[in-house]
UniProtKB/Swiss-Prot annotation:
Gene3D superfamilies: Hotdog Thioesterase (3.10.129.10). Involved in unsaturated fatty acids biosynthesis. Catalyzes the dehydration of short chain beta-hydroxyacyl-ACPs and long chain saturated and unsaturated beta-hydroxyacyl-ACPs. It comes from the Bacteria. The active site is at H57. This is 3-hydroxyacyl-[acyl-carrier-protein] dehydratase FabZ. Belongs to the thioester dehydratase family. FabZ subfamily. GO terms for molecular function: (3R)-hydroxyacyl-[acyl-carrier-protein] dehydratase activity. HAMAP family: FabZ (MF_00406). The keyword Lipid metabolism applies. It is found in: Cytoplasm. Its EC number is 4.2.1.59.
């Protein structure tokens, strides 16, 4: 297999994921690499003050919820998975199955740009395992191990 390094815009992301505003958590894919040695993807989530979640979390000191950072990571793994195996059919969904060892290092707020780095580790019985690291300005804000499953609906 040859090495691929590519980027994806929002329309290409929307072709791969069923999520839409306000729950689409990936704005662009800066690059991904699929080779025999590694399968990785770097995605971007721009955190805007206009995010609906900031109306209640928290109005005086907006904090982007950790669970949404994890959702952004999970969406990045879905994009990576579908770039590895091809675009999903209309009756396929990619489910976030589990998360292990999630750690939050610092809060994320309006104006931050989340850089989401995910790596495919292995697949067994239709369940894929990934690692994920989210950073802001080079500083780690969240790490986790994620498992996802592609299923017919």
């Amino acid at each position: 297999m040859t090495t691929e390094k590519k980027s994806l815009g929002i329309q290409e992301i929307m072709d791969l994921l069923p999520h839409r505003y306000p729950f689409l958590m990936v704005d662009k894919v800066e690059n991904y690499e699929i080779s025999d040695e590694r399968k990785t993807l770097r995605a971007i989530k721009n955190v805007s003050f206009n995010e609906p979640i900031f109306q209640g979390h928290f109005p005086a000191k907006p904090v982007f919820p950790g669970v949404l950072i994890l959702e952004a990571m999970a969406q990045a793994t879905g994009i990576l998975a579908f770039t590895m195996v091809g675009k999903p059919s209309p009756n396929e969904l990619y489910y976030f199955a589990s998360i292990d060892n999630a750690r939050f290092k610092r809060p994320v707020g309006p104006g931050d740009q989340l850089v989401l780095d995910v790596e495919f580790l292995k697949e067994r019985r239709g369940i894929a395992k990934f690692t994920g690291v989210a950073t802001v300005n080079g500083e780690v804000v969240c790490t986790a191990e994620l498992m996802c499953a592609k299923r017919e609906v």
